[in-house]
Amino acid sequence: MIPNTPSITPELVAEHGLKPDEYQRFVELIGREPTITELGIVSAMWNEHCSYKSSKVWLRTLPTKGPRVIQGPGENAGVVDIGDGLAVVFKMESHNHPSFIEPYQGAGTGVGGILRDVFTMGARPIAALNALRFGDPHHPRTRRLLAGVVAGIGGYGNSFGVPTVGGSVGFHERYNGNILVNAMAVGLAKTDEIFYAAAAGVGRSIVYLGSKTGRDGIHGATMASAEFGADAEEKRPTVQVGDPFAEKLLLEACLEIMQAGCVVAIQDMGAAGLTCSAVEMGAKGDLGVELDLNAVPCRETGMTAYEMMLSESQERMLMVIADGKEDQAEAIFRKWGLDFAIIGKTTDTLRFVVKHDGDVKADLPIKELGDEAPEYYRPFTETPPRPVLGPSDVNHAVSVADALERLIASPDLCSKRWVWEQYDHLILGNTVQRPGGDAAVVRVNEGPKALALTTDVTPRYCEADPFEGGKQAVAEAWRNLTAVGATPIAVTDNLNFGNPEKPEIMGQFVGCVKGIGAACEALDFPVVSGNVSLYNETNGQGILPTPTIGGVGLIDDVEQSMTLAFKAAGEAIFVVGKTDGWLGSSAYLYTVCDREDGAPPPVDLVAEKRNGDFVRGLIKDDFITAAHDVSDGGLLVAIAEMAMAGRIGASVDGVPAGMPAHSFWFGEDQARYVVTLPANQAAEMVRRAEAAGVPVTKLGKTGGDKITLANERPIFVEGLRDRHDSWLPIYMGAN
């Protein structure tokens, strides 16, 4: 009989985030009342963050296979073949709740956690990205949270030595009480040297590696599976503390130990720490696990079994060592100044047994904790469709020129240079395109291949129509990769939503996942990894549905990558794709008209594929000189961004009869790109487009120092640049 103190009360169960019926299910499973350590273990393994119990049923519907896919969802990261015996290993993951409570450490350890997911697979990290969402800029907390998160990301990534090469930042009042910090890491590995989490072989040593265990982060995973109330600030002790220099040592030691042939299975200690890593290794390998916590290296005295099992101290790994390799593995880790301790063994019992001070603190069935955790088909209601806005439904109170200046200096569309200048985006020396373009481009070793990387989502669209919003997030990632000349190969997703127990929120989740699946299927763009973050609510107010897509593309020859800047005066400007002037749920409507209504633009996936393949062909043929996808803000914002990047003006027109100029210039119709080419190639451009069945329209030509439009005052490029570049530094510099 396992001694059972303290006794388990309904209040204690509720504090651990378990519903009464879940607790009852657990009691029936083990046939007795659990110990406090067992309650802690099951609360960690069965919470939303670790078990995906509300989302699993829908995640299974996503397309996850493809000719390049080596490993899809279910491991620490996705693995995709890029040829020449190499694979790209990548994943995106949220650290939303910790970053709201303690922004510097929360964001920093989010970066650390996702880097570990990548190098656990045997890959050396080569790039990091992020997608950040903050509240209304006027909210008293927003500036402090933004400063802390950006400093935390930069502090960890820069110290670890990985370039942060891209990302996105957005603002909306719906994030006032729950910011989003989605971190993505990308690494390179040899295709025949990928390492997995599933334990193999009975009686093998289970080894603890890395930094010592402390009391930081206990119940971090449980906190990440709950709504916030007014006491959110008091949860600061549940936020982990990171040490990027220890993580750098851990990376080098892990890669060396892998090369030495010592590793049977490896898992990083992330959410729920030792509990989750040990259970996952055993459950995936159909083996039992027995741990002796007296062997765990601790940095604090008197730690209980409960605390050791649930600590989320950072920079730690769990490994199953090949027979007879213990001494060799230990020598490698000691060389790097890291802890190495044999803390258990694999068994054939399918039990998860935890001992401390000679007592059994937990004895549980391992499969039911891990891959057989509860699963819910939660009831949902579909988001009611919004009406389509016609040209007469929008009152254009300002000129096109004034609207452009307002958009370009708005919080969502302004330059994020203030953010990315705090990140080292050039370390390792392989960054070809730095932040500020459509996608980051990072050389693969010495080249000629390169990877293109992006993070994308338009929460406004997902709120208005989750299915179309999910499709659009994937389509925009696909366009951004295409615009730099890459062939899109795979995605990772980070699905951020409110409380799934509310049918309308679950409906948003289901709609977005269906949209993501439809787009990934149509665009041959499989989902290979990802993360779900639910309960992003404070006092009952949920975030905008935010299914962030991290896209990865492959460029065969980095010399052929494309940028968005205008290159020379006198070149022809074309828009590829059809312009209908769609203003519903647009940035123009939100920023200039102070409205958030109307159906978002529909995403025609056949047109996306056709138009994108056409543009990629133009880039490969060296036919065009610049390319930029059209997204937030529409056509004129895209042209302005190209003009500002190249410091060259443009003379443009082309508004069709009967369409308001504001609709033409600021509508957010999908599947569009702006491209430039030598003026003498304009007729050939039209011929190529007709042959491909792609609509194109000539808009004008580059040149001068201003953007000129019919019936509008000229807009000077340098003035636009000043507006674009100054909003964020001025905002962050204000008291």
Curated annotation (Swiss-Prot):
GO terms for cellular component: cytoplasm. GO terms for biological process: 'de novo' IMP biosynthetic process. Mg(2+) 1 binds at residues 93, 531. Pathway: Purine metabolism; IMP biosynthesis via de novo pathway; 5-amino-1-(5-phospho-D-ribosyl)imidazole from N(2)-formyl-N(1)-(5-phospho-D-ribosyl)glycinamide: step 1/2. Transmembrane segments: none annotated. The active site is at 49, 95 (proton acceptor). The keyword tRNA-binding does not apply. Keywords: ATP-binding, Cytoplasm, Ligase, Magnesium, Metal-binding, Nucleotide-binding, Purine biosynthesis. Substrate binds at residues 94-97, 116, 240, 312-314, 533. Mg(2+) 2 binds at residues 117, 268. Disulfide bonds: none annotated. ATP binds at residues 52, 91, 493, 530. It is an enzyme of class 6 (ligase). The keyword Magnesium applies. GO terms for molecular function: ATP binding; magnesium ion binding; phosphoribosylformylglycinamidine synthase activity. Its EC number is 6.3.5.3. It catalyses: N(2)-formyl-N(1)-(5-phospho-beta-D-ribosyl)glycinamide + L-glutamine + ATP + H2O = 2-formamido-N(1)-(5-O-phospho-beta-D-ribosyl)acetamidine + L-glutamate + ADP + phosphate + H(+). It is found in: Cytoplasm. SUPFAM superfamilies: PurM C-terminal domain-like, PurM N-terminal domain-like. HAMAP family: PurL_2 (MF_00420). NCBIfam families: FGAM_synth_II, PRK01213.1. Part of the phosphoribosylformylglycinamidine synthase complex involved in the purines biosynthetic pathway. Catalyzes the ATP-dependent conversion of formylglycinamide ribonucleotide (FGAR) and glutamine to yield formylglycinamidine ribonucleotide (FGAM) and glutamate. The FGAM synthase complex is composed of three subunits. PurQ produces an ammonia molecule by converting glutamine to glutamate. PurL transfers the ammonia molecule to FGAR to form FGAM in an ATP-dependent manner. Belongs to the FGAMS family. This is Phosphoribosylformylglycinamidine synthase subunit PurL.
